[in-house]
Amino acid sequence: MTNNNSNSNNNQTISNLSAGLKSVNLADQQQNEVNLNLLQQQLQNEATTQQSQSRISQFFQNQPTEGYTLFSHRSAPNGFKVAIILSELNLPFNTIFLDFNNGEQRAPEFVTINPNARVPALIDHFNENTSIWESGAIILYLVSKYLKDNGECALWSDNLIEQSQISSWLFFQTSGHAPMIGQALHFRYFHSCPVPSAVERYTDEVRRVYGVIEMALAERREALIMDLDVENAAAYSAGTTPLSQSRYFDYPVWLVGDRATVADLSFVPWNNVVDRIGINLKVEFPEVYKWTKYMMRRPAVIRALRGD
């Protein structure tokens, strides 16, 4: 997000400078100096771009023969989402963080593996350098391949019905959760001019999305407590004893089944930045907060978010 802001500020500065120069009659010598400076800046930018693109070119000319290569960005939650799954599956991978300021995402070699020129993208060097783009597609590829190679995958399922439930939440995250937070961040921090109605609209939609998740997790918790806290189940059902008094009230619950899957873990990086749009998960969505807290403690998640 920071890089986008930097681009916006730079563009605005250049635009203001251009407008200012039009209103001033410069002497020939001064004009020549300005032209020279602009030319030097242009040449420097071109050299930097060639250097950055050559970094990508060099990689594609000498690709590894094993492991995975993840193309990401330091400010891209979707890239870290894929890194979490790679880490959870204990798969060997290397991350290349693209420099958007220098246009590395538009390098011809990168566009051949992701025509959308965005991150994340993944290359599987074990499988003839197969490339996959879009975070949801990458995740499904990884867990499906892991299941095929190992016979089981804790983050996925070999049951078609459970697979469809996991996929539903994964697609909900990629199509509803992430884009709404992304738009709320954009209009709050990076848009060229304030648009309060857009900020309100997207923030409200993020809250609606979290309401869906909160309800699902609350239902899972109630079922867990009623199943495990048998001696108090009648009191909970009658409403004479609140569920919050159960010793199982803080046990982890998951969207599908009794374990964390990609349905859960795909939400982590975006949950980690939602406070920047003024949403307090702990106060507004306590089940989502507890769920996120449990996932953030997982060693693989910690490694992935650190960029290890």
Swiss-Prot record:
Q: Looking at the Swiss-Prot or TrEMBL record, what is one Pfam family this protein matches?
A: GST_C
- Example GO BP: negative regulation of transcription by transcription factor localization
GST N-terminal domain boundaries: 66-150
Checking Gene3D superfamilies in the record gives: 1.20.1050.10, Glutaredoxin
Q: Which InterPro entries match?
A: Glutathione-S-Trfase_C-like (IPR010987), Glutathione-S-Trfase_C_sf (IPR036282), Glutathione_S-Trfase (IPR040079), Glutathione_S-Trfase_N (IPR004045), GST_C (IPR004046), Thioredoxin-like_sf (IPR036249), Ure2 (IPR017298)
Gene Ontology cellular component? cytoplasm
GO MF terms here are:
glutathione peroxidase activity; phosphoprotein binding; transcription corepressor activity
Alphabetically sorted, this entry's keywords are: Nitrate assimilation
The GST C-terminal domain, residue ranges: 159-308
Where on the tree of life does the source sit, at the highest rank? Answer: Eukaryota
Q: Which family does it belong to?
A: Belongs to the GST superfamily.
Tell me, how does this one assemble? Homodimer.
Record function comment: Plays an important role in the cellular response to the nitrogen source. URE2 gene plays a major part in the repression of GLN1 and GDH2 genes by glutamine, and is required for the inactivation of glutamine synthetase. URE2 gene product may catalytically inactivate GLN3 in response to an increase in the intracellular concentration of glutamine.
What is the protein named? Answer: Protein URE2
**Organism listed in the record:** Debaryomyces hansenii (strain ATCC 36239 / CBS 767 / BCRC 21394 / JCM 1990 / NBRC 0083 / IGC 2968) (Yeast)
**Gene of this entry:** URE2
